[in-house]
């Protein structure tokens, strides 16, 4: 058990019988009253989010989930199948992938972290950065060079990313999977 004040982003807490990952914490202190902790949470079973507040001294059940490095194997509708180093396969429902689904492609070499709760694979965390090829984007507009000009681009896997104006179809780009932002051309 931890107090709400000790909870940090990345911790997993048990709330109303479900595991919730803490995405953001904000502590507010006032002169007379105790500290209030505002938490932004994501339900690992339902893939939904919420914000809630606690008093700084409130006790919360902190849980540790099993995580395993795996590689993407194949898609069997509606499940994505991942495999660990010992060739054990784990099914993750497509709805539990969230934003990660846009970055998963056949033959990808990046290792993902599969999270387990009660022996069941419930979510997948992509590496911080990945490299994908641009399969469609509009050509650059001539003369539009003032400031940081961005345009939408479709990448392998079907996701859409805002990229710099100089990026063309066929370019490989590095993407930050936490924010979905273009980092650089590779």
Swiss-Prot record:
MF GO annotations: translation elongation factor activity
Main location: cytoplasm
S-S bonds: none
Compartment list: Cytoplasm
Gene Ontology cellular-component terms listed: cytoplasm
Alphabetical keyword list: Cytoplasm, Elongation factor, Protein biosynthesis
Residues annotated as transmembrane: none
Protein task: Involved in peptide bond synthesis. Stimulates efficient translation and peptide-bond synthesis on native or reconstituted 70S ribosomes in vitro. Probably functions indirectly by altering the affinity of the ribosome for aminoacyl-tRNA, thus increasing their reactivity as acceptors for peptidyl transferase.
GO annotation, biological process: peptide biosynthetic process
Gene3D superfamilies named in the record: 2.30.30.30, Nucleic acid-binding proteins (2.40.50.140)
Pfam families with a match to the protein in the record: EFP, EFP_N, Elong-fact-P_C
Classification lineage: Bacteria, Pseudomonadati, Pseudomonadota, Gammaproteobacteria, Alteromonadales
Full protein name: Elongation factor P
Source organism: Shewanella sp. (strain W3-18-1)
Family statement drawn from the similarity comment of this UniProt entry: Belongs to the elongation factor P family.
